[in-house]
């Protein structure tokens, strides 16, 4: 299986920065309170992303962001993740100028994709997910620059 990172066989994806780290949680309200107490995190956006079956809270932590994800149903990707692994880091999201172009670049290099084309995500931005097989074990999200 091709690997997107250490040997450079796929990409490079044109990344402008890390948009957020996604954390799967069982209870969104409790997690928001915990992160607020822990590091003064403040909610920037809180919304439901129906397409992905999650309620999310995007928290500002210094210069970075954490996206807390609570599953709306057990039979969603985040619900299955929570069932399999419990709460914890779910994905790393990279900000890119053009999600579709980066997906094409990855597909041409043989990367395993979860999404073949962009779909709506948090804040109405286009997003797409790259399978952990292509990244050495980490679920990666591409997020259109806002």
What do the predicted segments below correspond to?
Residues 31-34, 102-106:
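Hydrophobic side chains in well-ordered alpha-helices
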Residues 22, 67-70:
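Short, conserved beta-strand edge motifs with alternating hydrophobic and charged residues
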Residues 5-52, 76:
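Long, hydrophobic N-terminal alpha-helical segment
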